[in-house]
């Protein structure tokens, strides 16, 4: 993990772009791991446990590296806000919303995350959204629609297009997630004495405690809401390593050189990677719209990258 994070500090363009998609590639495995963990224990308990465990591990890394994690007074409220909005509420609303939605429809809603990230960056960081950037975002949305219409595993004609509570919850979760990432980027700029690792450690521990408290109120503890301890420990361990420790921290590191809009756009490839895993490992049919969708994604990615480089939001090196 530390080796990957060190590579993130290079920020040479080819390496940085490679790390962005490598991060999405690794993060896409968290869907299967989360499903496995949910089969072994209650969802809120799973979320709280992995957040607290990951936060403790990050604090341990800070102690090992002898880095300061002293919390400046001006950073207290932003970190609490990040913990509640970007970690706790995002995960809780996402879980509740997913219970009433098909995976393809949830995937479609998540496809709007670059637009919400662009809006949050405009409001919080005063980043300008140009027509060229909107064109790149639109190409990404087209690739998403192509993938869902021709490459998804479900018939989208069976979707109900009414806007119900599950849809609203997932839309809110998407917006809160984008807000959380832009808040993290703003916090890292304002509190230079506090590292990304320390910020994530505090946010994960606080969000984990809130999730466990929520679990204690709404889920049955007898003595713990775990049905399969071995599977639970295996799944939680893998989630902590791949999602919380590697992906969260690498994504946060990349925010130093790329906007949350660009990174959110690049993360649209995660469902495409999931389809690749299904074809390679499970023998599922290769989605016919996959290559077409990837082509649009690459074009949109280049448009946004060059526009943000011109605006000064993307840094080639530090």
Curated annotation (Swiss-Prot):
Residues 25-148, 191-304 form the EamA domain. GO terms for cellular component: plasma membrane. It is a multi-pass membrane protein. InterPro entries: AA-Vitamin_Transporters (IPR050638), EamA_dom (IPR000620). Its main location: membrane. The chain crosses the membrane at residues 7-27, 44-64, 76-96, 105-125, 134-154, 163-183, 193-213, 231-251, 262-282, 285-305. It is found in: Cell membrane. Keywords: Cell membrane, Membrane, Repeat, Transmembrane, Transmembrane helix, Transport. Belongs to the drug/metabolite transporter (DMT) superfamily. 10 TMS drug/metabolite exporter (DME) (TC 2.A.7.3) family. Transports S-adenosylmethionine (SAM) and S-adenosylhomocysteine (SAH). Allows bacteria to acquire SAM from the eukaryotic host cell and to likely remove the toxic by-product SAH. PANTHER family: INNER MEMBRANE TRANSPORTER (PTHR32322), S-ADENOSYLMETHIONINE_S-ADENOSYLHOMOCYSTEINE TRANSPORTER (PTHR32322:SF18). This is S-adenosylmethionine/S-adenosylhomocysteine transporter.
